Swiss-Prot record:
Residue numbers on the Cytoplasmic membrane side: 141-142
Organism: Mus musculus
Major localisation: nucleus
Name of the protein in question: Taurine up-regulated 1 protein
Tissue expression pattern: Widely expressed in the adult with highest levels in placenta and testis. Also expressed in a number of embryonic tissues at multiple embryonic stages.
GO CC field: mitochondrial membrane; nuclear membrane
Signal peptide: 1-40
Topology feature Extracellular, residues: 41-123
Length: 142
């Protein structure tokens, strides 16, 4: 089955806040829109049975969107397709360099070599890891 074409405008030549706004809005529609299903909405209770704060949920959502936007702008990952999924690039083995296995897409930038590692890509990987760790820390019950 052929893969759908990438969403237009996710990776562009613009820089700064314009890219962050465009990427953040598309990521919001991809990952958090209620039409995507129950998994896109915050659960009513945390796994430990305690009520999860909406403030924490919003902080996690903003952190995730910022981490993805930073990584996409640096050329580490790219969002393709629809349905709120980040898919492996064609020709990449599942889990290669730990990127596809982490739910992110390894891809080849038109102007440079293949970027398939989260660490060592002009600092973008480190911040992406920090963002994911922060999300995990905030989602864990006390």
């Amino acid at each position: 089955m052929a893969r759908p074409p990438p969403l237009p405008g996710l990776v562009g030549r613009r820089s700064g806040r314009a890219v962050d706004r465009a990427i953040g809005w598309r990521l919001f529609l991809l990952l958090w829109h209620p039409a995507l299903g129950a998994q896109a909405r915050p659960p009513r209770r945390a796994p430990g049975g305690r009520w999860r704060s909406r403030r924490v949920f919003l902080l996690v959502r903003r952190t995730r969107a910022a981490a993805y936007a930073f990584a996409i702008r640096r050329g580490v990952v790219r969002v393709v397709g629809g349905g709120g999924q980040l898919r492996p690039a064609p020709g990449e083995a599942a889990g290669e360099a730990g990127v596809a296995g982490a739910g992110l897409e390894a891809w080849r930038h038109p102007s440079g070599p293949a970027r398939t590692q989260l660490e060592g890509q002009e600092g973008a990987g480190g911040w992406l890891v920090v963002g994911f760790l922060l999300c995990l820390f905030l989602l864990m019950p006390p």
